[in-house]
Amino acid sequence: MKEHKARKRFGQNFLQDTRIIGDIVNAVRPQADDVVIEIGPGLAAITEPLAKKLNRLHVVEIDRDIVCRLKTLPFADKLVIHEGDVLQFDFNGISGKKKIVGNLPYNISTPLLFKLAEVADDVADMHFMLQKEVVERMVAAPKSNDYGRLGVMLQYFFDMELLIDVPPESFDPAPKIDSAVVRMIPVKHRIGKADDFEHFAKLVKLAFRQRRKTIRNNLKELADDDDLQAVGISPQDRAEHIAPEKYVALSNYLADKAV
């Protein structure tokens, strides 16, 4: 079969390190009847070992040439192929608690993670290969350089752990950056429940809009010093010093005050 060349516009870098592949499959722990969705199966490096353990495997792929290849594989009868852009994919259209796995294209990773947060209630767990820098931002704790909006928002929905470091030579073509595998497990209200999620999301976005400024300056449209101090936030603090649960508490305090 004609060799498939990675396409930059789809952010394709194909995993080829058998040890890393085995570690990812072991982390996913697929059982025969699990509902598993793989994003971007590519040349089936993870697809094949997953399919061996599953009765059925859903795959989402935008590249038509790869879709054609998938249909010719020996285990193709186990695959449910969804051709199209994963950012437009209806995850709720597949019933059951889902395990989602994938080597995510770096160029769409952040919007895709926010999209997946919206379906967290129907997810058992997720395992993704991502740019290591992104994973470090996702799992970062307050008062660290990597802590920011992405971490706060995803930590609202998930417990997350960096599982596996993946060097560039594990891929073909080799990217210019390091990668890592992250495990994401939905946890309801781990940092408290936002009474108005849209308000909470807006507040967090504003808080981190200018990292060098104080929280007083960044949130002056929404809160004054008394509001901040009411939930234990110093107006002189910067956004990266404030724990996720404090943002939830402030959002709820302001929502109650507005009623």
From Swiss-Prot:
Entry keyword set: Cytoplasm, Methyltransferase, RNA-binding, rRNA processing, S-adenosyl-L-methionine, Transferase
Q: Does the keyword Heme apply?
A: no
Q: Which domain of life is it from?
A: Bacteria
Q: What is its EC number?
A: 2.1.1.182
Q: Where is it mainly found?
A: cytoplasm
State the compartments where it is located.
Cytoplasm
GO annotations of cellular component type: cytosol
Q: Which InterPro entries match?
A: KsgA/Erm, rRNA_Ade_diMease-like_C, rRNA_Ade_Mease_Trfase_CS, rRNA_Ade_methylase_Trfase_N, rRNA_adenine_dimethylase, SAM-dependent_MTases_sf
Q: Which HAMAP family does this one have?
A: 16SrRNA_methyltr_A
Record's NCBIfam families?
ksgA
- Kindly provide the name given to this protein in its UniProt entry: Ribosomal RNA small subunit methyltransferase A
Annotated source species: Neisseria gonorrhoeae (strain NCCP11945)
